[in-house]
């Protein structure tokens, strides 16, 4: 799972969970076929479709020099009916 950074929890991503769609941020250089292969191999699910878009990096200033944070890519992964990805929440004891 080198390409997938983390799953995103926003209002939209929670709404998409009802449609069996999962949202995650991935590395910019990863391709759709790589991400699809990793998701199917790691979670044992079947992927129907994948949508992606690039999110812009935020501007950061250090004195007179203006820089920016890294750009990253967000993938919306649609699974076949009957498949799901278990929650990745660590239980506190």
UniProtKB/Swiss-Prot annotation:
Quote any Pfam family the record assigns: Ribosomal_L23
Biological process annotations from GO: translation
Its GO CC terms are: chloroplast; ribonucleoprotein complex; ribosome
Which coarse location class applies to the principal site listed for this UniProt protein?
Answer: plastid
- Known SUPFAM superfamilies for this protein? Ribosomal proteins S24e, L23 and L15e (SSF54189)
| Gene3D superfamilies the UniProt entry points to | 3.30.70.330
**PROSITE patterns the UniProt entry points to:** RIBOSOMAL_L23
What keywords appear on the UniProt entry? Chloroplast, Plastid, Ribonucleoprotein, Ribosomal protein, RNA-binding, rRNA-binding
Per UniProt, subcellular location reads as: Plastid, Chloroplast
Q: Name one GO molecular function term.
A: structural constituent of ribosome
Q: Say what the protein does.
A: Binds to 23S rRNA.
Q: Which family does it belong to?
A: Belongs to the universal ribosomal protein uL23 family.
Q: How does it assemble?
A: Part of the 50S ribosomal subunit.
Task: Cite the PANTHER family for this sequence.
Answer: 60S RIBOSOMAL PROTEIN L23A
| Protein name, UniProt field | Large ribosomal subunit protein uL23cz/uL23cy
Organism taxonomic ancestry? Eukaryota, Viridiplantae, Streptophyta, Embryophyta, Tracheophyta
